Amino acid sequence: MPATDHQWSKPAAMAIPKEGYFEVQRGRYGPVFPRTPACYGFSIIAKVKPGREDAIREYGKVIEAAIEAQPELLAPLRLHYLRWVLFDVGFGLHFQYQGIFDTDFDKYTEDAIKLFTQSGVTTVFTNLEGFPDDWQTNPEAFVKFVRDHQFPSFLEYGEYPYVTADEIKKALRLKAAFSDMLDQMR
């Protein structure tokens, strides 16, 4: 859903209830989380399987190389940003997956399963405790894992709220075209 007329021009913040939504609206796999000034997203925190830290770090390099070889690889996910963090606060190593994207929670998860199954690139989640072995053929189990490990934010802010990644790229292409045009006029 694109930003409405000039909705993007005024920064916006949204305080979100503890549950992660304002009213229960059922999606395919559970409650629908709201679109916020930062679009859609989730923060998943899960314990890392013993001895898998190096595999997770290496997987970051795999994704980097895959994107270098095929820049549009993750395009079906309609991502703005991904951030991965490993941390230990005394209870074992944990992994945090933060994603900001333009689709709802359930669609993002379904698209991720499809993308990883078709591309042959697996998911980093295979290194996490409790992640289902049959994730490629059992979307319900994949979604259950993601929802069980989702920690909803309670505040989201957007400097340019509700703007999709496609709208941002379009604006940047337009800016580049204008710059090129002005350079030609010199």
Residue ranges and their predicted role:
Residues 118-133:
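Conserved short beta-strand edge segments in small beta-sheet-based binding/regulatory domains
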Residues 2-94, 100-115, 131-186:
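Short S/T/G/P-rich N-terminal loop/turn motif that feeds into the first structured element of a domain
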